[in-house]
Amino acid sequence: MTKKNFEQLSDLNAEFFESAKLSLLDPLGLYLANDVKWIKLNQNWNSLKFPVVMGGKGQPILLLHGFDSSFLEFRRIYKSLKRNFQVIIPDLLGFGFSPRCATNEYNSSKIISHLIDLLKTLKITKNLKIIGASMGGSTALKLAYEIPDSIDKI
């Protein structure tokens, strides 16, 4: 596939999400979905756009969902956390609304690489707090091992 094909697929993914979110019945889910930003990553990820919920100000806090889930997992606590933190909730690589053509490999190492590139793109290099649910918890530990100087608390 060409770079243009990847970009077109990425745009279609974002367009699909924007129309699909309107069918969310849970008001907290819709509140969270309205804060999704599509963050374009580097060539390692075919320059695709990835969905990341971002809101609030303050110390950054990264929320990592569990297996077979999405950023919507945190809809019940997002509004509350957003009052005091810069909340960042990505869909983990290969889950939720993340583009499936970003890589042909989906494993814990790729998920960590993806998160590191996302944090670099967002210029988050220190004082990061992480909350991980289920698989997101083990991902948080692996991420802290890889970038210990960036992590404040898990």
Question: What are these language model-derived features?
Answer:
Residues 48-97:
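Conserved HGGG/HGGXW glycine-rich cap/lid loop of the alpha/beta-hydrolase fold
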Residues 61-63, 71, 99-101, 137, ...:
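Basic, gly/Ser/Thr/Pro-rich low-complexity segments located predominantly at protein N termini
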Residues 1-61, 82-85, 124-126:
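Alpha/beta-hydrolase fold catalytic core
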Residues 75, 116, 141-145:
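Short, hydrophobic alpha-helix immediately C-terminal to the catalytic nucleophile
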Residues 84, 122-154:
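Conserved hydrolase catalytic core segment
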Residues 30, 35-46, 50-53, 89-131:
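Active-site loop/oxyanion-hole signature of alpha/beta-hydrolase fold enzymes
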Residues 78-81, 104-106, 146-149:
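Glycine-rich, phosphate-binding/catalytic loops in enzymes
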